[in-house]
């Protein structure tokens, strides 16, 4: 009888130990996330991914491996629609994320209301990058239409940055032509006649201008302009801030159907929320994005951003 009891006790202990091992294994299992992002966020998310992974392991005891895919924002949106299983998307325009919601129904149409600031944790704008000394004397949008000026911008059909470029030029035209859309259209059309090549994404256009030496002026995300000077030196390029530009608000979203399929909802939600944290805001500013909460950033990083009149999509084009 005693032997039988001892055997039962041993079996219970073994079962408990086995259950503990399974439980520990479940806790220790690494999480994996795929962030499908737009073209010039490589450096930003390289640092942010490392910071979030450290934060998640310290607070949750779980390792997380984060892969990030980059490309023109419109092209990336189409990839997700066609089946690329992103856990989160961090794209250049709300329009691109709307298209995923509408065409693939991977998350609700009201996705933009689920995080603060219309789900845009940082902002940017459009500036001009010119060669050192500004040999073509480019100061504002009308200078881009001059004969002999070669303008580099990506393709608006595939690039979110290119669409911000287009909207900024259009907003300027509406201002100087007092709302006359026909004159504004002619203005923007003339600008694009000076574009010799249309790359698919913003980083490709930066490469065309910076490394291949094509063009007199690059219409650039502000962060791309700063990064070009950081990497190649202030003796190569100058930044020209136009009299008017646009408040670019690159949004982020959770891809509900995919995170539920992957079992990553909790970590993916935390990943996006961490963009709004003091650390996330510091990292954004460090990489030349304008943080929503500048009080969390290094004051030296904030001081780099020039003052510029910024219009919004809603203010110029309506909601």
Residue ranges and their predicted role:
Residues 133-139, 158, 171-179, 258-266:
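Short helix-loop capping/hinge motifs at secondary-structure junctions, enriched
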Residues 259-319:
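Extracellular/periplasmic juxtamembrane helices and adjacent flexible linkers that interface
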């Amino acid at each position: 009888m005693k032997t039988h009891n001892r055997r039962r006790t041993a079996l219970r202990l073994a079962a408990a130990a086995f259950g503990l091992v399974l439980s520990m294994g479940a806790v220790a299992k690494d999480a994996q996330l795929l962030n499908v992002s737009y073209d010039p966020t490589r450096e930003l998310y390289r640092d942010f991914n490392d910071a979030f992974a450290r934060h998640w392991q310290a607070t949750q005891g779980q390792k997380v491996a984060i892969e990030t895919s980059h490309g023109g924002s419109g092209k990336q949106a189409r990839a997700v629609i066609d089946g690329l299983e992103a856990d989160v998307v961090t794209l250049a325009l709300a329009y691109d994320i709307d298209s995923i919601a509408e065409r693939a129904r991977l998350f609700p149409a009201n996705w933009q209301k689920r995080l603060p600031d219309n789900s845009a944790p940082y902002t940017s704008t459009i500036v001009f990058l010119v060669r050192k000394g500004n040999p073509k004397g480019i100061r504002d949008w009308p200078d881009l239409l001059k004969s002999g000026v070669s303008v580099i911008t990506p393709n608006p059909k595939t690039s979110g940055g290119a669409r911000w470029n287009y909207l900024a030029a259009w907003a300027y035209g509406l201002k100087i032509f007092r709302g006359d859309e026909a004159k504004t259209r002619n203005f923007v059309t003339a600008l694009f006649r000076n574009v010799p090549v249309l790359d698919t994404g913003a980083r490709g256009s930066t490469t065309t201008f910076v490394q291949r030496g094509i063009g007199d002026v690059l219409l650039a995300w502000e962060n791309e302009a700063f990064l070009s000077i950081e990497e190649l030196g202030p003796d190569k390029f100058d930044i020209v801030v136009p009299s008017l530009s646009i408040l670019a608000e690159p949004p982020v979203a959770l891809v509900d159907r995919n995170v539920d399929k992957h079992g990553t909802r909790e970590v993916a939600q935390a990943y996006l929320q961490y963009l709004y944290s003091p650390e996330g805001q510091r990292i954004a500013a460090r990489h030349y994005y304008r943080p929503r909460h500048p009080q969390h950033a290094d004051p030296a990083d904030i001081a780099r951003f020039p003052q510029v009149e910024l219009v919004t999509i809603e203010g110029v084009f309506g909601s």
